[in-house]
């Protein structure tokens, strides 16, 4: 990681900790800044690793019995915007030069009405792969929120898609990003639809699909991170517009800022860690983690320590 990004990450996390300690913008009975810090760190780690951020953002309050987010959906949506804005900042900062290069290439291909370089092709595939999940997210969000996301469902999805990742990662690495095809882009884009379900993981399912299609581990991870930019940017705008129209819920400013800073800081480290790891290793540790997490969920429910719903 570039030194300036490392320093920026450290400063952002330290600022979040100081704000949480000062309880800035906190309201009695609402989500505390310390809880927001924990969820921001969770988001930064799990959004960018193939282990499902949406699942962990449900499981952490479930384990801690934090009922406030469940009982206040308006606050929850506002806080969710802040967390995703944080990880968006992390990805844009880390891949800034790649993003600028791809945008310039995409604009150039529009002007010439043709595709003549690898960058232009990758830029178009990122755009194509974004469309299916964006449509489902825009029109199916309420259905997903109402019917999916219970801990017992998360345990199933963590297991099922963890096994799929393990199988996919055994496929030969035959392509880099330059070897992407139109069919690959569409296939990875369609797979993103499944990521709306907590426990699947957006990065996990796109990496899984990429590996099934022959992408190398590093290429699959990089393409997954690039896909995060437009889909998360669109989600932040879409949800942010709703929040702006309804107004900020009381007590949301402090947790919003703390969570966003923590997610951005930890997200930068998570990107560097994953890319460095998969250059030398496979995705098996993440598969093992998913299976262990699912087993713990089932054990907690079976023992009566926690309810199967939240």
Walk through the language-model features, giving the residues of each.
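Multi-pass membrane proteins that catalyze or facilitate reactions on polyprenyl-/lipid-phosphate substrates
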Residues: 1-310
């Amino acid at each position: 990681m570039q030194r300036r990004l490392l320093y920026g990450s450290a400063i952002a996390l330290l600022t979040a900790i100081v704000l949480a300690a000062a309880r800035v913008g906190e309201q009695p009975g609402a989500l505390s800044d310390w809880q927001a810090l924990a969820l921001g760190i969770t988001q930064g780690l799990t959004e960018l690793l193939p282990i499902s951020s949406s699942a962990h953002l449900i499981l952490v309050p479930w384990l801690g019995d934090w009922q406030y987010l469940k009982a206040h959906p308006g606050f929850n949506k506002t806080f969710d915007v802040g967390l995703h804005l944080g990880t968006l900042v992390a990805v844009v900062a880390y891949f800034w030069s790649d993003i600028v290069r791809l945008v310039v290439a995409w604009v150039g291909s529009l002007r010439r009405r043709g595709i003549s370089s690898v960058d232009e092709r990758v830029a178009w595939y990122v755009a194509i792969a974004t469309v299916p999940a964006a449509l489902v997210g825009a029109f199916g969000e309420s259905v997903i929120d109402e019917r999916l996301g219970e801990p017992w469902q998360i345990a199933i999805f963590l297991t099922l898609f963890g096994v799929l990742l393990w199988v996919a990662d055994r496929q030969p690495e035959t392509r880099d990003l330059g070897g992407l095809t139109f069919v690959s882009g569409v296939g990875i884009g369609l797979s993103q639809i499944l990521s709306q379900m907590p426990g699947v993981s957006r990065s996990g399912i796109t990496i899984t699909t990429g590996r099934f299609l022959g992408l190398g581990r590093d290429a699959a991870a990089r393409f997954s991170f690039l896909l995060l930019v437009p889909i998360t940017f669109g989600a932040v705008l879409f949800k942010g517009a709703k929040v702006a129209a309804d107004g900020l819920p009381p007590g949301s400013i402090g947790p919003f800022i703390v969570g966003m800073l923590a997610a951005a800081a930890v997200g930068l480290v998570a990107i560097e860690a994953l890319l460095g790891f998969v250059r030398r290793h496979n995705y098996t540790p993440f598969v093992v983690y998913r299976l262990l997490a699912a087993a713990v969920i089932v054990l907690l429910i079976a023992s009566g320590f926690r309810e199967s719903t939240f």
